[in-house]
Swiss-Prot record:
Pathway(s) annotated for this protein in UniProt: Carbohydrate biosynthesis; gluconeogenesis; Carbohydrate degradation; glycolysis; D-glyceraldehyde 3-phosphate and glycerone phosphate from D-glucose: step 2/4
GO cellular component: cytosol
Superkingdom of origin organism: Bacteria
Task of the protein: Catalyzes the reversible isomerization of glucose-6-phosphate to fructose-6-phosphate.
Predominant location: cytoplasm
Active site: E358 (proton donor), H389, K515
The species this protein was found in: Mycobacterium leprae (strain TN)
Record-given protein name: Glucose-6-phosphate isomerase
Length: 554
């Protein structure tokens, strides 16, 4: 398909009309009633994918809903579009590119020919170079300019070059086994870099500059400041021993002073928000090693295969994406909460924000026509039980419908005894997981509360309406493979929703104009230049106030 081909309006299809009628029939039905009608739904509406046990029974759906949603997916040619993406067809139509993040985790002995090239060979060639480099780093064979071992890698990137590595580093911290830690710098606010470097020793620090073009403003600004910090301490000759690059621009990498032999490449068919399993993960491989990184990739591939081969009716990412669309377009939900009951997944919701919202936050379809329905779920969240003491009040008794994904693990990597010295803190954590999904679903009625002797005037305040939908995702333990499975589960949900909405989930034109405006305003803010075009009164006043407070003429 090219960007010029018209895309049928999914809201004008019989499948959409059937779902609308179905919503009229069951939209007001409470989860209490769904479970009363079918007490076994908690054992029926479940899927196991790899190490993930996914319970979607606490959603406001029936078996009929699932079938109608699958019919909608087929009306949107989801299976054909999925196969096209996996085969390397240019499904990113606005940029005329393949979308092949799934190729990053294909086994070495497979083959995928795209534009005459076996991309699997290319991927594993880079993985081999990454592995050889990180082996040297981890063993101490690679030393800094002073001869000392590297004990800290600082990843400088932004967006997909930062959010993924930050999240995975925290999630897999227990797998760090070579005495190397990582820090991550992304914000152009100088406070970020200053804080990250404040207690580091230049001689034991390695910088990874992650920028495909090696021209990203924030990344190059931070990298230049980091370079100055290093050379002030160790001299210019130290740059080649303390800087490596993840990029495709050899000329600019060389000009920066980085030996291009220490440049790790990737491809235009890897979007930033889908790149954590590419060379963008170099900092992670340095910390956890090539074997754990390979396990991470294998987890992605498990879910990729399921997404490719499982029937839509039992395809986990497809069903979860369809359920998200059900809430967004038929029940009026605007956001989805992601609630990991694992402190190691503290950055998972922030990672998913970019993955989902940059992908599907579009108002124009791939053929250039306006969308005719809501798109782009708003993702947000916090770890349990922290969120319970912050925003769960709104989830339980507020007026907004917020479907939530609960993620938990049976076996903790860390555990401690409870106050009595006997119980498990992890058991206490997970008892909250199960209790919250139960109360969100079933609530507590006024009659039940009154029967407990609650004063009549207090009863309305204690009613828990329930009927708040959740997905429960359980795994045995948070391992590299399980983390890869979780990420791929959400990647393919994004694709599913994007296909049905008819949008291009793999471009991000909405972030470009603000960058250009910032470039135009910088000389106005810092010097005496006049703006290229008349500023609106608000921006003009703000700029003048800023200049005055910076000691510049207004």
């Amino acid at each position: 398909m090219t960007s010029m081909q018209a895309i049928p309006d999914i809201t004008a299809t019989p499948a959409w009309d059937a779902l609308r009628r179905h919503h009229d029939e069951i939209g007001a039905t409470h989860l209490r009633q769904f479970f009363a009608d079918n007490p076994n739904r908690g054992r029926e509406l479940v899927i196991t994918v790899g190490d993930l046990y996914i319970d979607y029974s606490k959603h406001r759906i029936t078996h009929d809903t699932v079938q109608l949603l699958v019919d909608l997916a087929r009306a949107a040619n989801l299976e054909q579009r999925r196969d096209q993406m996996l085969a390397g067809v240019h499904v990113n139509t606005s940029e005329n590119r393949s979308v092949l993040h799934t190729a990053l985790r294909l086994p070495r002995d497979t083959e995928l020919i795209v534009d005459g090239q076996n991309v699997v060979q290319d991927v594993h060639a880079v993985l081999d170079v990454m592995g050889d480099f990180t082996d040297r780093l981890r063993s101490g064979e690679w030393t800094g300019a002073t001869g000392k071992r590297i004990n800290t890698v600082v990843n400088i990137g932004i967006g997909g070059s930062d959010l993924g590595p930050v999240m995975v580093y925290q999630a897999l911290r227990h797998y760090a086994d070579a005495g190397i830690s990582a820090r991550f710098v992304s914000n152009i606010d100088p406070a970020d870099l200053t804080a990250k470097l404040s207690d580091l020793e230049p001689g034991t620090t390695l910088f990874i500059v992650a920028s495909k073009t090696f021209s990203t403003l924030e990344t190059l600004t931070n990298a230049t400041a980091a370079r100055r910090w290093l050379t002030d301490a160790l001299g210019e000759a130290a740059v080649s021993k303390h800087f490596v690059a993840v990029s495709t621009n050899k000329r600019l990498v060389k000009d920066f002073g980085i030996n291009t032999a220490n440049m790790f490449g990737f491809w235009e068919w890897v979007g930033g928000r889908y790149s954590v399993d590419s060379a963008i993960g170099l900092s992670l491989m340095a910390v956890v090693g090539r074997e754990s990184f390979a396990d991470f990739l294998s987890g992605f591939h498990i879910v990729d295969q399921h997404f490719q081969n499982a029937p839509l009716e039992s395809n986990a990412p497809v069903l979860l994406g369809l359920i998200g669309l059900w809430y967004s377009d038929f029940l009026g939900a605007q956001s989805r909460a992601v609630l990991p009951y694992s402190n190691d997944l503290a950055r998972f919701a922030a990672y998913l924000q970019q993955l989902t919202m940059e992908s599907n936050g579009k108002s124009t379809r791939a053929d250039g026509t306006p969308v005719t329905t809501n798109t782009g779920e708003i993702y947000w969240g916090e770890t349990g039980t922290n969120g319970q003491h912050a925003f769960y009040q709104l989830l339980h008794q507020g007026t907004r419908l917020v479907p939530a994904d609960f993620i938990g693990f049976s076996q903790p990597i860390d555990d401690l005894p409870t106050v009595d010295g006997i119980g498990s803190m992890h058991d206490l954590l997970m008892s909250n997981f199960f209790a919250q999904t139960q109360v969100l679903a079933f609530g507590k009625t006024a009659e039940e509360i009154a029967a407990e002797g609650t004063p009549a005037e207090v009863v309305p305040h204690k009613v828990m309406p329930g009927n708040r939908p959740t997905t429960s995702i359980l795994a045995n333990r948070l391992t590299p493979s399980v983390l890869g499975q979780l990420i791929a589960l959400y990647e393919h949900q994004v694709f599913t929703e994007g296909v049905i909405w008819g949008i291009d989930s793999f471009d991000q034109w909405g972030v470009e104009l603000g960058k250009k405006q910032a470039e135009a305003l910088l000389p106005v803010i810092t010097g005496n230049a006049s703006p290229a075009q008349q500023l609106d009164s608000s921006t003009d006043t703000l700029v003048r106030r800023y200049r005055t407070e910076r000691g510049r003429t207004s």
